[in-house]
A protein has these predicted regions:
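Conserved AdoMet/S-adenosylmethionine-binding subsite of the radical SAM
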Residues: 44-192
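Canonical Radical SAM [4Fe-4S] cluster-binding loop centered on the CxxxCxxC motif
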Residues: 1-37, 41
Length: 192
């Protein structure tokens, strides 16, 4: 698996993310060619140009930057990644990670837009199943809470019919029985 970035830095300041430690925060979004070059350089280094039995079998968009803030470039990259004359990765060989933006793009929520226009696996960075704690870990939760995220994830599933991955880093303060019960409750509502 290769992990790709969509920007240089990130201004979301998620507490558990190494990118949040960069002093300048978001420097800029990456261009399509810069996103693509990450996998091209790795494939070239590994001599991984076979059409079957690839060394890099899957790719995750989980590096620096929030996918939802570079959608147009990400969409073009994913088209290249999926195209059988280019990188030739199927939709289930690519996972796009997001903190769960519920803002709008072209009259759709970002998550719904990703489902309609990108059509890959989606991974949601949750990291706490309790809003008050997620507010501290991931300040974007104050704007887009878990409660606002769940209906958007259901829409994503209806569009793609792909299960949604829940990302949850085990931290000292998010492993209680209360957290586990809240996480189970969320996962019962979201096809994951």
């Amino acid at each position: 698996t290769i992990c790709l970035s969509v920007s240089v830095g990130c201004y979301l300041s998620c507490d558990m993310c190494a990118t949040a430690q960069i002093p300048k925060k978001l420097v800029r979004n990456l261009s399509v060619s810069e996103i693509t070059s990450q996998i091209i350089l790795c494939k070239e280094y590994l001599k991984d140009w076979k059409t079957s039995d690839k060394l890099i079998k899957t790719q995750v968009i989980m590096g620096q930057g929030e996918s939802g803030y570079n959608l147009d470039h990400l969409k073009t990259y994913i088209e290249i990644a999926k195209h059988n004359s280019a990188l030739d990765y199927g939709r289930t060989r690519i996972t796009v990670s997001s903190v769960g933006l519920c803002s709008k793009k072209d009259d759709l929520s970002v998550i719904e837009w990703i489902g309609k226009n990108i059509d890959t696996y989606l991974a949601i960075s949750l990291h706490s199943s309790i809003n008050s704690q997620r507010d501290k870990l991931m300040p974007i939760n104050k704007k887009f809470s878990i409660d606002s995220l769940i209906p958007e994830l259901k829409k994503y599933y209806e569009i793609t019919k792909l299960p949604i991955f829940i990302e949850y880093i085990a931290l000292e303060d998010n492993l209680s029985e209360e957290h586990a019960k809240a996480l189970v409750s969320i996962m019962k509502k979201v096809p994951s």
